[in-house]
């Protein structure tokens, strides 16, 4: 199947700043002190396919903020899948600015389709905004529970995240530990740190210092692939 057809964007939504710039011009929505407005732009392609579905559910990191969507790591995963002749279709459900609470609210609608592998990438915006970690943990757990309620056979991959120590070391450490603890408690696959080898490397991030460049996205894709590939049948 043609790569463009296989890479269906179930939901591409961009968080626009007050000045209404395009994604490549705007500041990062992940800055907790900046008020934002959320504008959803929905694009769906409904071509029939017998392929199994891998759904990436996340925030601007998944949505490839500041880049063309083809440069994002979900599309890089699709390219790897296609190169091996595997019958999987990647769906990118990344929403810029998304918190775990927002993800929890929209997940039920996203799961109206059959999903074989669900990759959960949320929490970074919670951490940057200092949201109570009890809420972050509860929301992530609720999303895992909902995926299993919808389809117990869906395999889940949890993408671990880390944040700078702006909120203090206790908060930062507890935030980092949420992901391995939830992965162990729920017996789901864990990507230890989604931005391994990218975070803190200026040349691999946009000017905001948060979102990966195209080269950074390729490294993220390799990090994800190390965990995802063994799951694919």
What does each model-identified segment do?
Residues 19-23:
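Bacterial signal peptide processing site
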Residues 30-96, 106-114:
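Serine-esterase "nucleophile elbow" of acetyl-processing enzymes
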Residues 104-233:
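Alpha-helical cap/lid subdomain in secreted, periplasmic
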């Amino acid at each position: 199947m043609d790569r463009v057809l296989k890479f269906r964007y179930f939901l591409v939504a961009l968080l626009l700043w007050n000045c209404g710039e395009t994604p490549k011009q705007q500041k990062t929505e992940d800055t907790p002190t900046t008020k934002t407005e959320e504008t959803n732009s929905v694009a769906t392609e409904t071509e029939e396919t017998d392929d199994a579905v891998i759904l990436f559910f996340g925030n601007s990191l998944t949505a490839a903020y500041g880049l063309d969507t083809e440069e994002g790591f979900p599309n890089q995963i699709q390219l790897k899948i296609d190169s091996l002749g595997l019958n999987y279709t990647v769906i990118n459900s990344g929403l810029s600015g998304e918190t775990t609470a927002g993800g929890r609210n929209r997940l039920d609608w996203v799961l109206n389709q059959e999903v074989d592998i669900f990759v959960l990438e949320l929490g970074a915006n919670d951490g940057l905004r200092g949201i109570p970690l009890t809420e972050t943990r509860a929301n992530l757990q609720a999303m895992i529970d909902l995926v299993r309620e919808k389809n117990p056979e869906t395999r889940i991959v949890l993408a671990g995240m880390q944040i700078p120590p702006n909120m203090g070391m206790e908060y930062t450490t507890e935030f980092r530990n949420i992901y391995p603890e939830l992965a162990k408690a729920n017996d789901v696959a864990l990507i230890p740190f989604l931005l391994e080898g990218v975070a803190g490397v200026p040349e691999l991030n946009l000017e905001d210092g948060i979102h990966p460049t195209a080269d950074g996205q390729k490294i993220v894709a390799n990090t994800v692939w190390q965990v995802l590939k063994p799951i694919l049948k």
